[in-house]
Amino acid sequence: MVWPLYRTKIEGALLRKGAKQGGTAEVTAFRLWNCRGGGPFVFLPERMFQMKNVQKYARNYFAPPAQQYHWSQREYIAQAPRWCSVDLRDGNQALVVPMDLEKKRGFFQFLCRLGFREIEVGFPAASDTEYQFVRTLIEHNLIPDDVTIQVITPAREAIIRRTVEALAGCKKAIVHLYNPTSAAQREQVFHKSRGQIIDIALQGVRTIADCVGRMKGQIQLEYTPESFTGTEPDFALAICDAVVQEWKPTAELPVILNLASTMSLSLPHIYANQIEYIDTHLRDRDKVILSLHPHNDRGSAIAEAELGMLAGGQRVEGTLFGNGERTGNVDLITLALNLYSHGVDPGLDLSNLPQVAQMYEESTGMSVSPRHPYGGQLVFAAFSGSHQDAIAKGLTWRTQHPNAHWNVPYLPLDPEDVGRSYEDDVIRINSQSGKGGIGYLMEHRYGINMPKEMREEFGYIVKGISDHQNRELSSDEVHQIFTDTYVNLSAPIQLDDFYFMHKKVYHTTVSLTVNGEQFELTGRGNGRFDAVSNALRKGLNIRFHDIVYQEHSLERGSTSRAIAYVGITADSGETFWGSGVHTDIASASIYALFSAVNRLLSF
């Protein structure tokens, strides 16, 4: 809308029929006057200024006590966290059709290949499929030695025992215990006091300890005070300390405290303050791994995770492309590549991101948005002419400075590092494109390096076709437009043959066909090209001057082709361009001249 750009005055409101003058009424429309023009400017839609019922909402988070929080003084994240994929549980439970056993198995192996070393594989007590999946991984020896599986359970004795039972024979695993702690759930769902909620958590810890005491494998405890962000900080600290004291971890095998933004409630910096408060007040901090588990309800899961890492978070749970309940979990791919783009190795192999997206879509039935950070089909695409020109010049600069840090305009990282290409994924051609992007595409994909003026003309031709057809053009279509417009044109004049003699100057005889009639022209000049040019001028009375010529090889090798570009200026002052392609560079220049002349005659 353009109206906010002007100073306006409101004359009045049209009141809903039946409303009293001076009383309360819904605004149907405002008439505004443009103070520059003085006339009625725009009518505004009904109820534009306020949503109903805003008064029933309030801030439902609990900020920690005021203190000096140091995370805000840290400029960047210096190393990658421990990653834990929860795709097979948190992500899978949010799917319309959850993955079957075979899909889960394939997805687990795929996560291992990407480099995940902690993977939550399910809720074994929730269903037979979940239980059998865990057993399949263990019994078929599908868990790599450097990978730890994680299973989740609420703090209920029967469910805990069934969960731990599923781990029989596992070399190492994480048992993830949770119970809700937020003020809302204590009051509305469980009707329990703080002390009773702590007792539930501790009883769960004791049950796990009892079960794993008879197991041979190594079991690490993870505890989540579910809805941490809606829990009073002092109570969150108290229940975390109580769990740590009950479990008695060591520095060698610490307990994982997973501080989940189960539902995002605040600005990201509040979550960071909550994390740092726990980080700096825990009793046995050296025996604890602080884990983050942000959700994306407010669209800020990435920011929460990154600020949470600055605030002391050492581990992050999330999913590929942010799959999960409601608006999803934090996207581990975006987090990892944010680190990568700052020169920090994320420890995950995302070098073929299109394949990762394909596997994700096939396994989950979900789709990756074309604008999803890093993984979307269009995230590196530039349609705008000015953007394409800047990218093309930036990429050219990099070829001249190959050891410089990546700093190409509009590209946060090198698309080739994640399995994308400049020609197919970056420079995209439509009616908004410019000569820079089109020229870059032609040069780097097809080896065609047009003169600057020709490149500008060709850019307008391509944009016009895209605009007329109202669609994007593929690179092959752009190349075909170039060929059809410029290369070896044979109408209205068809070049049949030519030969030369050299006696101080070059003499040429040119055989050609014009509208079905054959001609033979002769001419002479200082060079072959000059001789043919003079033959055309004299023999067909074609007037042109100010010839521009450029040529280069299209390929390498003894049988490579050359391409030539010729521009001629008519008496009208307009320049006409043509191109010739041939294995002989001299012949290519002659064909280019004929192409330019044919375009002049067809104008």
Question: Whereabouts are the PLM-identified features?
Answer:
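N-terminal capping/small domains of soluble enzymes
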Residues: F43-E157, V426-I429, S433-K435, G439-L441
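A mid-to-C-terminal "edge-of-domain" accessory segment
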Residues: F49-R89, G343-T522, S558-R561
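Hydrophobic faces of well-ordered beta-strands that scaffold small-molecule active sites
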Residues: W83-V86, I119-V121, D145-T153, A173-L177, ...
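Alpha/beta enzyme core
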Residues: L101-L114, E157-R186, F190-E222, E226-R285, ...
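Alpha-helix-loop-beta-strand connector modules within alpha/beta enzyme cores
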Residues: E130-V151, L202-C211, Q274-L290
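Catalytic alpha/beta core domains of metabolic enzymes, predominantly
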Residues: S266-W397
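Positively charged, aromatic-enriched nucleic acid-contacting surfaces
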Residues: T508-L512, L554-W577
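Mixed-charge, glycine-accented linear interaction segment located at domain edges/termini
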Residues: E574-W577, V581-F603
